[in-house]
């Protein structure tokens, strides 16, 4: 008896193994979207948690997650940072694996309110699912101030995280501005004024007076930062409008042009004269007088400081964050004041000699300011064109730095020149792909002549019009990476084209994922893309010939020989 049971188990196992060995290579090995991305939610008054349990080997796109309330008001949703994923057609994208928990704060929800959640993911094997939409019913929530209070903090943190550099960069910018031709030569004079012309002060006393002067200057800048941040907070939504972003980008570009010497930005000379006379009336050498001198000095903008200061102020207005606004301008003023403190304590011997290098520092800050328009325009024009703008800026900066370095005569500068030249060559790569890769891609995508269909009725009509010929239906979408790989690498192959010469070629573009697309995918029982279906001369599909997932030209050609009806 035991021997019979053992024999039966062995036969069952053998059947399973052989079934796996001879399984159709094109047959779908992928699970439905609800199993790949198990979605759930839980609400507790104002707090709603959305969770996705992501199956191993699958991932969700961060940028494809959208939440739309109906008869409800929610706080801005802050998506957590994902991990970077890169492919040939879409570049770098942030994705989520394993598990995603997304907290949503509900400020107010009426009876019958809902939340529409849209998301999309793919499998590592190259299989992508259409966007999934779930409707989350919400319990009634009454608006109150306590629930809305954390919203501004979260929103500020979100905008802060999206900005291109941290406030600590302001300290480095301030130090760099100190070495421009408009500022550095003034430091010995300012030092003498701060000390009141007294040459025999102790080091501690001199350091204290200079520190007080810098704090007075920093106070002016900090107050300015707080005012601009408060104004930005009131108009935060407007500051994200494409037209406003384009306008700000133009302003930043003009500020950068002033750093390149095309024109001069500064306060009117009459106002500068009044502020200077007011500062000169203060008594140098006394803490109170020195503090007032510093505060007034913060209002006197030289041509070298106006553009960077304006850029930082616009940066702060974008953030709408009060802490960031005050802190950034304080660190900026502190950076400008550090060289002054060193000169006051140690004397002019620490000052580098004036020369053309100071103009080069000013020009370098022009390139730094140019990075801000690129950052703003990237939100409007998209990642692809944004990368090209970054590429152009990188080529311009490294090219300028390389040409400037050719004037140096020291041997070690040759190493720097090689590094700068290599950086310029690396930066130009996205522009090369744009200039020389687009035409080739367009050509390869026209090799197969597909007839486009949209609905189930159009598919049935096309099958009738095939008049006994075999039919291949390619389901395509712009968000499907493997679909683009099929077009570029597989459908362009001469062997594949030859094998499909007598086949009617149909293609359904389901990028929009509208009602007609959903109905077509449901009718064909398609889980995701890429999926290629084969029909015989009678219009009947051969399920065993169905292809899911990417195949290279050689594998697909073999599949056509073995499977095509």
Curated annotation (Swiss-Prot):
Q: For this protein, what is any one GO molecular function term?
A: protein-disulfide reductase [NAD(P)H] activity
| One matching Pfam family | Thioredoxin_2
Q: Where is the signal peptide?
A: 1-19
Query: A single GO CC term, please?
Result: plasma membrane
What keywords would UniProt list here?
Answer: Cell inner membrane, Cell membrane, Cytochrome c-type biogenesis, Disulfide bond, Electron transport, Membrane, NAD, Oxidoreductase, Redox-active center, Signal, Transmembrane, Transmembrane helix, Transport
The protein's Enzyme Commission number? 1.8.1.8
**What family does this chain come from, according to its entry?**
Belongs to the thioredoxin family. DsbD subfamily.
- What protein name is recorded for this chain? Thiol:disulfide interchange protein DsbD
List the taxonomic lineage. Bacteria, Pseudomonadati, Pseudomonadota, Gammaproteobacteria, Enterobacterales
């Amino acid at each position: 008896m035991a021997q019979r049971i053992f024999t039966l188990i062995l036969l069952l196992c053998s059947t399973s193994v052989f079934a796996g060995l001879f399984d159709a290579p094109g047959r779908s090995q992928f699970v439905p979207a609800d199993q790949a991305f198990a979605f759930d939610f839980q609400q507790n008054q104002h707090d709603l948690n959305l969770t996705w349990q992501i199956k191993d080997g699958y991932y969700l796109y961060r940028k494809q997650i959208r939440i739309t309330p109906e008869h409800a008001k929610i706080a801005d949703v802050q998506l957590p940072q994902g991990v970077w994923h890169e492919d040939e057609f879409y570049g770098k994208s942030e994705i989520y694996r394993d598990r995603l928990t997304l907290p949503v704060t509900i400020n107010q929800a009426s009876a019958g309110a809902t939340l529409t959640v849209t998301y999309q993911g793919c499998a590592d094997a190259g299989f992508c699912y259409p966007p999934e939409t779930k409707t989350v019913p919400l319990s009634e929530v009454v608006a109150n101030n306590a629930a809305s209070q954390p919203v501004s903090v979260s929103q500020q943190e979100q905008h802060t995280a999206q900005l291109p550099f941290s406030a600590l960069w302001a300290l480095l910018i301030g130090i760099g501005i100190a070495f421009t031709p408009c500022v550095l030569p003034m430091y010995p004079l300012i030092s003498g004024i701060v000390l009141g012309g007294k040459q025999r002060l102790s080091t501690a006393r001199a350091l204290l007076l200079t520190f007080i002067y810098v704090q007075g200057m920093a106070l002016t800048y900090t107050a300015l930062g707080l005012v601009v941040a408060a104004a930005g907070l009131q108009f935060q939504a407007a500051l994200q409008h494409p037209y406003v972003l384009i306008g700000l980008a133009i302003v930043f570009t003009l500020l950068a042009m002033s750093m390149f010497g095309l024109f001069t930005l500064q306060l009117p000379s009459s106002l500068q004269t009044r502020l200077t006379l007011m500062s000169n009336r203060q008594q140098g050498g006394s803490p109170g007088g020195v503090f007032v001198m510093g505060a007034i000095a913060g209002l006197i903008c030289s041509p070298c400081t106006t553009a960077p200061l304006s850029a930082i102020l616009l940066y702060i207005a974008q953030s709408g964050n009060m802490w960031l606004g005050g802190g950034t301008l304080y660190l900026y003023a502190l950076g400008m004041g550090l060289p002054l403190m060193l000169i006051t304590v140690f004397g002019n011997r620490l000052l580098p000699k004036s020369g053309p290098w100071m103009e080069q520092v000013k020009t370098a800050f022009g390139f730094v300011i140019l990075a801000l328009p690129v950052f703003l325009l990237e939100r409007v024009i998209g990642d692809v064109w944004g990368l090209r703008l970054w590429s152009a800026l990188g080529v311009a900066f490294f090219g300028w730095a390389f040409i400037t370095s050719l004037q140096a005569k020291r041997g070690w500068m040759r190493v720097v020149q090689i590094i700068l030249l290599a950086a310029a060559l690396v930066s130009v790569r996205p522009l090369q792909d744009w200039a020389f890769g687009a035409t080739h891609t367009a050509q390869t995508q026209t090799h197969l002549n597909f007839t486009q269909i949209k609905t189930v009725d159009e598919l049935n009509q096309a099958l009738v019009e095939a008049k006994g010929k075999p039919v291949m239906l390619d389901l395509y979408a712009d968000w499907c990476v493997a679909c683009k790989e099929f077009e570029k690498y597989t459908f362009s192959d001469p062997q594949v084209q030859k094998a499909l010469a007598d086949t009617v070629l149909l293609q359904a573009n389901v990028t929009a994922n509208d009602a007609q697309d959903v109905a077509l995918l449901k009718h064909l029982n398609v889980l995701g893309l890429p999926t290629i279906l084969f029909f015989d001369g009678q219009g009947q599909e051969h399920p065993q010939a169905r292809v899911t997932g990417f195949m290279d030209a050689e594998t697909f050609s073999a599949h056509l020989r073995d499977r095509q009806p």
